[in-house]
């Protein structure tokens, strides 16, 4: 995390960005997030990138989760049924995998406003066990933006019942305009119309 936050902010010493006043100070430097909405509610778009090895969403990672990610309005969402290789206790998904899904939908919620960011802080509450082989839905959304400091929230729900299985909050450091352009070009990022059902299970935005 240390090297990622330093790279995102482009200056030494920004690893303290998660510590209150230091966050505000580091966020005041460089470009603020654009805030340009690229997805509107009810118009679900699929996030497409070049093949890569991200554990959460990379097509080239044979051990990964292979999440399909979508944005709808100001949120990112995904649905997946976790296979046995992600087991913790018998029949239950490992907590680290749940954290990964929550982090991923929060990180990509920034794409709904044409931004990219790196995780500075993540807090997770586990509500109920996540069963293997059963479809779950992850949803992440932005709660506030202060210059380049973006606060987010997320949850994992059972789409059949609406029961909340896990929740999270996180802080991201948004990339400046030059770094964002570099990343978008490297990964050939684009948003395309999604055939998937974008219906949210409700809840806070």
Task: Give residue ranges: language-model regions.
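A conserved beta-turn-beta hairpin within the catalytic core of GNAT-like acetyltransferases
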Residues: 77, 115-117, 148-150
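Catalytic strand-loop segment that frames the active site of acyl-thioester-processing enzymes
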Residues: 3-4, 50-93
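Hydrophobic core residues within well-ordered beta-strands of beta-rich domains
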Residues: 65, 118-120, 136, 150, ...
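Hydrophobic beta-strand-centered segment that forms part of the acyl-chain substrate-binding groove
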Residues: 23, 29, 104-137, 142-143
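HotDog/MaoC-like acyl-thioester-processing domains
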Residues: 1-45, 130-132, 143-205
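Short beta-strand micro-motifs enriched in acidic
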Residues: 70-72, 141-145
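Conserved N-terminal beta-strand and adjoining loop/helix that marks the start
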Residues: 96-100
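Residue-level recognition of well-ordered beta-strand positions that form the cores
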Residues: 79-81, 123-125, 139-141, 155, ...
């Amino acid at each position: 995390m240390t090297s990622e936050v330093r790279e995102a902010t482009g200056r030494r010493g920004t690893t303290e960005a998660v510590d209150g006043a230091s966050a505000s100070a580091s966020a005041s430097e460089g470009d603020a997030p654009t805030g340009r909405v690229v997805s509107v509610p009810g118009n679900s778009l699929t996030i497409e990138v070049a093949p890569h090895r991200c554990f959460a969403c990379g097509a080239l990672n044979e051990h990964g989760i292979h999440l399909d990610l979508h944005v709808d309005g100001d949120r990112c969402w995904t649905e997946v049924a976790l296979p046995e290789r992600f087991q913790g206790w018998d029949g239950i998904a490992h907590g680290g995998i749940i954290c990964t899904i929550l982090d991923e939908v929060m990180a990509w919620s920034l794409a709904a406003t044409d931004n990219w960011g790196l995780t500075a802080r993540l807090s997770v509450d586990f509500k109920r066990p996540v069963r293997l082989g059963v479809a779950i839905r992850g949803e992440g959304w932005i709660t506030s933006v202060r210059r380049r400091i973006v606060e987010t929230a997320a949850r994992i729900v059972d789409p059949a019942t609406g029961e909340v299985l896990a929740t999270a909050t996180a802080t991201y450091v948004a990339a400046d305009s030059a770094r964002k352009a570099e990343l978008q070009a490297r990964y050939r990022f684009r948003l395309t119309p999604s055939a998937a059902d974008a219906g949210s299970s409700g809840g806070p935005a």
